[in-house]
């Protein structure tokens, strides 16, 4: 079991219940899922690009990504409906906790010129979205084997009702927010 999951069950639940005055442990916010999304627009011109993106995403997430396709044809972007334009992974359960641990302890500290995560990236319902500019911050990615530096979106979906609750939950996991 991941250390963060143990920490959540042993200390975070009690802290948040006390802070927000919850009467039941089921009211305490929890992380429901983490979604990783990588947009690969260049895949329209070169099919190999998508294979590299899928390989990187598989290494980072520990599970096979789903290829996302264009819903509409857009002449300006030179894409047709059904063209592969990205990939995504939804992590839940044990894999989610292990990824969160790697993200907080290893990947985020490796971001170049890092000054803290923006606290404004909450969506109003306690979910947090962040962007990563380089996939090489993850230790699973071998720098010599990548074809191109690619970024990705990471969305942490929580059961929190407000941004304040969501922030308190992520603060309890030592998320490095800007002060």
UniProtKB/Swiss-Prot annotation:
Chain's role: This is one of the proteins that bind and probably mediate the attachment of the 5S RNA into the large ribosomal subunit, where it forms part of the central protuberance. In the 70S ribosome it contacts protein S13 of the 30S subunit (bridge B1b), connecting the 2 subunits; this bridge is implicated in subunit movement. Contacts the P site tRNA; the 5S rRNA and some of its associated proteins might help stabilize positioning of ribosome-bound tRNAs.
GO molecular function terms noted in the UniProt entry: rRNA binding; structural constituent of ribosome; tRNA binding
Keyword annotations from UniProtKB, A to Z: Ribonucleoprotein, Ribosomal protein, RNA-binding, rRNA-binding, tRNA-binding
Keyword RNA-binding set for record: yes
Pfam family, one: Ribosomal_L5
Transmembrane segments: none
Protein name: Large ribosomal subunit protein uL5
Signal sequence range: none
InterPro entries, alphabetized: Ribosomal_uL5, Ribosomal_uL5_bac-type, Ribosomal_uL5_C, Ribosomal_uL5_CS, Ribosomal_uL5_dom_sf, Ribosomal_uL5_N
UniProt cross-references to SUPFAM superfamilies, sorted A to Z: RL5-like
GO terms for biological process, alphabetical: translation
Entry GO CC: ribonucleoprotein complex; ribosome
Assembly notes: Part of the 50S ribosomal subunit; part of the 5S rRNA/L5/L18/L25 subcomplex. Contacts the 5S rRNA and the P site tRNA. Forms a bridge to the 30S subunit in the 70S ribosome.
Family that this chain belongs to: Belongs to the universal ribosomal protein uL5 family.
Record lineage: Bacteria, Pseudomonadati, Pseudomonadota, Gammaproteobacteria, Alteromonadales
Natural source organism: Shewanella sp. (strain W3-18-1)
């Amino acid at each position: 079991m991941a250390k963060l999951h143990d920490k959540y069950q042993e200390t975070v639940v009690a802290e948040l219940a006390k802070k927000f005055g919850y009467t039941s442990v089921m009211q305490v916010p929890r992380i429901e899922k983490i979604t990783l999304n990588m947009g690969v627009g260049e895949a329209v011109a070169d099919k190999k690009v998508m294979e590299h993106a899928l390989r990187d995403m598989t290494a980072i997430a520990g599970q096979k990504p789903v290829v996302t396709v264009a819903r509409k044809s857009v002449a300006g972007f030179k894409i047709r409906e059904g063209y592969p334009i990205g990939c995504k992974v939804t992590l839940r359960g044990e894999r989610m906790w292990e990824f969160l641990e790697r993200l907080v302890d290893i990947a985020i500290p490796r971001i170049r010129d890092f000054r803290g995560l923006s606290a404004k990236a909450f969506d109003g319902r306690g979910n947090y979205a962040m962007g990563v500019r380089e996939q090489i911050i993850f230790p699973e990615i071998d720098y010599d084997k990548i074809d191109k530096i690619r970024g990705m979106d990471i969305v942490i979906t929580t059961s929190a009702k407000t941004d304040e609750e969501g922030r308190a939950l992520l603060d309890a996991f030592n998320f490095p927010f800007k002060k």
